[in-house]
């Protein structure tokens, strides 16, 4: 659907599976006059994204290697996918009921999005945080500038949106991030939540506020420490 949207044309899709680990998709342009594909649905954080391309592209140089029928980056397998695919996937989760306790869901507050969007955003945040917390990678953050560098290295190179500004709020590690809108925003917020918890060794709470073209994320400790 993303390719059809970009090419303004319809395609036939067929696939072959050479082995248990590889599926090859074959696209052939369709000449018949058939109904157009559905447009990509919008969330609050995907509107006006065409104004925000530069933060997605300025991630520096890196080398991706063709290996074993796929792509390899720094020893890890990876894939390339259009960001709109993520939006389509998340849009289909809006009617799903979240299976998480009140203690978890109440650790994140939202301003500026609908209840259906809150459910989708929250599910994505905790899923991404859970994936990162499974790794053993240490996270050390000593200053606001290190947040930017860490995000560029761990998120930006893989196509995820990075914060445009970072500012410390107090001596207990609370910090606020400013983002432009992006289809990958929920994933980046979930990653930052996991990074913060690992760097500070505390359970995080988040306040997320959406404006017309930006999102502001405040992360602080869920528990009060004396």
Q: Which residues does each predicted region cover?
A:
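Low-complexity, intrinsically disordered Gly/Pro/Thr-rich segments
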Residues: 8-13, 199-209
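N-terminal accessory segment detector
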Residues: 1, 11-184, 210-226
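Short, surface-exposed linear patches
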Residues: 46-49, 198-202
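Short, non-transmembrane amphipathic alpha-helical segments
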Residues: 2-7, 189-200
């Amino acid at each position: 659907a993303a390719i059809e949207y970009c090419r303004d044309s319809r395609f036939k899709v067929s696939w072959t599976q050479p082995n248990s680990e590889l599926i090859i998709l074959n696209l052939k342009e369709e000449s018949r006059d058939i109904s157009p594909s559905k447009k990509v649905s919008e969330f609050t954080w995907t509107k006006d994204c065409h104004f925000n391309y530069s933060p997605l592209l300025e991630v520096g140089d890196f080398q991706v290697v063709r290996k074993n029928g796929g792509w390899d980056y720094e020893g890890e397998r990876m894939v390339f996918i259009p960001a709109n695919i993520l939006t389509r996937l998340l849009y289909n989760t809006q009617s799903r009921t979240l299976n998480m306790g009140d203690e978890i869901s109440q650790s994140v507050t939202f301003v500026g999005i609908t209840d259906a969007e809150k459910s989708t955003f929250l599910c994505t945040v905790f899923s991404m945080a859970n994936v990162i917390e499974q790794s053993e990678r240490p996270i050390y953050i000593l200053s606001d500038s290190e947040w930017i560098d860490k995000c560029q290295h761990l998120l930006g190179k893989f196509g995820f949106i990075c914060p445009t500004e970072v500012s410390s709020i107090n001596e207990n590690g609370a910090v606020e991030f400013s983002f432009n809108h992006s289809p990958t925003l929920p994933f980046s917020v979930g990653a930052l939540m996991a990074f913060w918890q690992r760097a500070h060794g505390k359970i995080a709470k988040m306040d997320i506020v959406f404006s017309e073209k930006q999102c502001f994320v405040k992360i602080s400790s869920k528990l009060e420490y004396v």
